[in-house]
Amino acid sequence: MKSVNLLIAEELGAREGQVAAAVDLLDGGYTVPFIARYRKEATGSLDDAQLRTLEERLGYLRELRDRRTGVIESIRAQGKLTPELAAAIAAADTKARLEDIYLPFRPKRRSKAQTAREAGLAPLAETLLARPETVPERAAQGFVDAAKGIETAEAALEGARAILIERFAEDADLIGRLREDFWRGGEAVAKVRKGQETTGQKFSDYFDWRERLERMPSHRVLAVFRGEKEEVLDLAFAAEGEDSAPGAPGPFELAVCRRFGVSARGRPADAWLLETVRTAWRTKIRTGIKADLRARLFERAEEAAVKVFAGNLKDLLLAAPAGGRATLGLDPGYRNGVKAAVVDRTGKVVAVETTYPHEPQRRWKEAVASLSRLCRQHGVELIAIGNGTASRETDRLATEILAANPDLKMAKVTVSEAGASVYSASAIATRELPDLDVSHRGAVSIARRLQDPLAELVKIDPKSIGVGQYQHDVTEQKLSRSLQAVVEDAVNAVGVDVNTASGPLLAQVSGLGASVADKIVSHRDANGPFRTRAGLKKVPGLGAKTFELAAGFLRIPDGEDPLDRSGVHPEAYPVVRRILEATKSDIRVLIGNEAALRLLSPAAFADERFGVPTVRDILAELEKPGRDPRPAFKTASFQEGVEKIGDLKPGMQLEGVVTNVAAFGAFVDIGVHQDGLVHISAMARKRIASPSEVVKTGDVVRVLVLSVDVPRKRIALSMRLDDLLEGATPPRGNAPRPDAQPRRPAPAAPPQDGALADALRRAGVSSSKRS
């Protein structure tokens, strides 16, 4: 049997030694970000994505190993463990295969087969299966025993049949093969329930629908499961030949027949055996297989949905920061007014206000004047506008503010406000902004997330940020674990200024956690900013191991040691000293000197502890200490006069922002309160496997309007801007129509009605836009 490390190595395409080293480090309490960045020699430079996969597979395979041990102990206790069975259990490479093998030995409720065996009917069953020339009724007469509850030959045959049915249904190899045959050839079939045609309209694409199981994309799987859960759809699995007439077995029944030597050759027991196979298939085997495939289909779709959510969250967290610029945050609304908050370049709140420029009060000029005064008073450079209800009207308000104050040279940006209301009412917001009304905290969050999306969004439960595909239909624990890993990797990829970071941001740093993060903030508040990384050791609860895990990701931009603002780990400072000695230079002269550093050979400074990969990273950090891997900040410009879906016309070319990436395409905010959909087939001239190959959440893109369905609130977009020149019809071949669907009846793009959450109902994305 292959070791866990070898299995993972084969899956990753890595050496077993690399995996073994990574496993040892993980077991030793080291974090994925730390291992990926500072233990490259040990792992052969496995990156964070590979390490996350390794970590996940390690957990699965260890669970499988433990379950395998439990199964062996259970079967041994029953006195039924044979060398062949032990070998089969050892070779089981999935939990499903292991459970198939264990099924005949699993403790179960009293069954008809067990009762029949206790009545002594096992020999009858074996005789009829082994010698079909036996006449069933005649053989059964010898097993009639009223004292055992077998009063007739028919009762004896019924008991023998129950024994064989259980045997057929618990054959691990047979069930595994039938399951795979059904998976490859089977279909999911959805029908609308009677009387649900109107109330279940959002699932109308699935009212009469079928699709091959193995080809179903995750969003359609979760859509039909949700329709079934909401009692709009009936969902069934079907395969050709699963139902057949008595005496004419279909392919699945024939597979059972072949496995146990049953055939129709005119012998006395043949018809009885064929009916036994038929009953076994229809009442037990098929039922179990369909339950297994339902679970498999959901798990596969769930895995894909979680992956989409994680990818979108990563893109959002690593979106370009506007940086330290005074920002006015506007949380739009009608009746309750537009909430405004000004934060200075450090994110500190310096002013809040509520204005009522829109219906029903329409105090437009007063709002322009008061907000202009705030901008001038606090030197505002950016205006961040939440993208919820009244966003476009508030955008016009901001435009007028800019026009009235040209000397301030301000810019306005529309910002996703998803999750801002959750933050406003959270314990974190109460702790950060105790004197601020809940209604103004959302405006603060909108302003800050423009300055630094990562620093602000870590304060919000990722599930509330609204970039997930069917996030409410997947397993909570699996989703949370994946998203937590994304947040941790993003924060550590960027690094954290230990003197300005909030507690929630520090909590995501490798090795820290909420408790130590709060202690760092308390120590900073009581003693002033940290001057060196070494000073972190004075924080209560921050021991040697925690310091080792965290120090490289914590930055001190204006500290005593220039290295403390870089990603060079303190443990590697001796390497830098050797470089300084060799170059006869001072750190303040060498750091940032790209020309001088690029003349150095990493191999010249490597030793037994710090190899070439680490030295190469050190030199790169010295070139650009504390470099931010996030892209440069830029904004989309919405077209004037295009403010609602009715303003759109096919052929328009517009600029927009990608708000969400799903398996079937990307949603783009083009400024009309309704995101449009760029289907995966309309993203590029070449065939692509995933929309994420082309776009990510937050990207500014230019799109072509293909079609607009105002009543259904559907907007079809294309990123192939020359489609219009071809009559909006892409060429045949590898680039199907933007609205192309699978050959079998399948749903069109999800209906887009209302706010983003409603727009993405069928795509499973939740993103509430607040009023």
Protein language model regions, located:
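C-terminal accessory/binding modules appended to enzymatic or scaffolding proteins
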Residues: 13, 320-322, 488-522, 640-678, ...
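Accessory alpha-helical DNA-binding modules that contact the DNA backbone or grooves
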Residues: 31-32, 47-147, 493-632, 639, ...
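Duplex nucleic acid-engaging cores and interfaces of nucleic-acid transaction enzymes
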Residues: 34, 50-53, 60-329, 333-424, ...
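Long, charge-rich intrinsically disordered scaffolds of nucleic-acid metabolism proteins
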Residues: 84, 97, 101, 413, ...
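A glycine-rich phosphate-binding loop feature that marks nucleotide/adenosyl-phosphate handling sites
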Residues: 180-187, 330-334, 388-390, 414-422, ...
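Long, charged amphipathic helices and adjacent flexible linkers at domain junctions
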Residues: 292-301, 305-310, 464-495, 604-650
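Single-stranded RNA-binding regions, centering on S1/OB-family and related RNA-binding modules
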Residues: 554-771
